[in-house]
Amino acid sequence: MISKVNKYPISFVKVIFAYSLYIALVFNYPLLAKVHAMFEMYPHDSEFFEYFFLFLLALTILFLLAILFFIFGTRYLLKPFIFLLLINSAILAYYKKNYGVSVDEGIITSLFDSIIEKNYHEVYDLLTNELFVKIVITALIPALPLYFIKIQYPKLLKEYVIRLSYICGMLIVWIAIVASNYKDISLTVRANRYLNKDVIPLYSVSSLLNIIKHSLSFKSAYVQLDEQPSIYKPEEEMVGIVVVGETARADHFSLNGYSRKTNPKLEKQNLSNFNNAYSCGTLTKTSVPCMFYVGDYASFDVAKANQRANLLDIITASGVAVTWFNNNSGCKHVCDQVKTIDLTKIYSEEQYDEQLIIELDKILDNNKSKKTLLVLHSMGSHGPKYYKRYPKEFDKFQPSCKNNNPQECSKEELINAYDNTILYTDHFLDLLINKLKKQNKKSFLIYASDHGESLGEHGLYLHGVPIKFAPEEQIHIPFFIWFSELYKQDRSFTILDAKTKISHEHYPHTILDAMQVTSKYFKKEKSLLR
């Protein structure tokens, strides 16, 4: 019987160093190979230093892991802690290898939000057979010895002395090694600061600790920014539609010069298109709160933004009827104070974005408000299941990727599937514009994507690279405005030059300007209307 298995006694110190060495070398081998390739491309004056730096990098990861185990791996927690870290490392290594993604605070909180908000489809989309095989081979099998060993600990006081001694000893050794060649080491590290995000699992562990730290910090009371905003001609009817796009790239919109006709319908509409627009984040978790933020853009912080009124709150306070329609992963607290219609809770299965129009019609048909703002959070081009974002009749570009793992499709198949999502977005937005035309009122539509998407460039897939390291593909977004003829007849204005570099910072002020809402937080110089 399993309960009678003889367990081999072994010191807790040996267990800690054995698993620290395994994680440091097996899961971080790609990082070490990356650094080696870096030296081959940009050789150092001394070949000895190149190998010395590789040794130091591996030793640093080993020591940090061991210190982590010595601090948190107490006698009752060491085995489960090692097990969890192995599982965590296997998952991180899989996503780093397959998608080029480093799991940071943004991705972790986004994942937690998806679970809390019951947006399980986002989690399911990332689960693959290859991932489970990776977990079994690199985590579960190496964890088996933990069952067959009995970890030996000395008396409690002696155990603490041993733990402290090893921690101090490792720090002394590390400092001595670094001090022996500090100048070259510091120069190399400063020139490659991004490498820290590739360390598995330490970068994600530190990100998780930061999240815990922030969650335990004091939260200030909700701040109402502007209790008395006003609106121009409150008795006049006007309908505004704001579409929050998902994962759309500017360079895959034919509106922006893409060789394929991915926007055949929008090209026939009289749009004001901006082809040099950039997002403020690479995750919906960050971008959506940022898009509706009306404070100092340079000091934007998601946690602080959630504790103060946003664009929608100000517009609502001016007397406009605001409704948020969700077909995505939630509004990230932006719509907490306004009416919300959530398709993910109405329907048991994922819906195409056209379903948003059916729900929108119900509001417009029974609308008694003079001023209305409808915000649609679309599913857009959300990956990795691009093929599930559009009906079969929009599967125009062939062959298209039908795999949940984009890296397993050819480049042609992947781009075809992604372009089909843009083609469907074109159709969806065209339907909205035509619906506004039929309203025969002053109306407008503003569209901007929350962020872009990597399709294999530089070995990256999906999105989520920290903004300061993010490639062009993940931050260059489509952004356009449409105004009805009645709107243009009633109001004299010009539009900012299409080639001007803009960002999400212009988004909330443009919406305020389009709705003609006056607020002390409105910055005319940040509006795209002149």
Language-model-detected regions and their locations in the chain:
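Transmembrane and membrane-interface helices of multi-pass
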Residues: 1-196
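A long, amphipathic alpha-helix that forms part
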Residues: 199-202, 358-361, 401-445, 481, ...
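Flexible internal linker/loop segments at domain or repeat junctions
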Residues: 391-413, 487-491
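Active-site-proximal alpha/beta segments of enzymes that process anionic O-linked groups
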Residues: 178-402, 476, 503-504, 509-530
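Histidine-centered active-site microenvironments of extracellular/periplasmic hydrolases
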Residues: 257-261, 441-442, 446-487, 522-524
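Active-site rim elements
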Residues: 45, 192-195, 299-301, 411-426, ...
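Catalytic cores of PAPS-dependent sulfotransferases
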Residues: 71-80, 99, 103, 314, ...
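Short secondary-structure boundary/capping segments
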Residues: 232-233, 437, 469-472
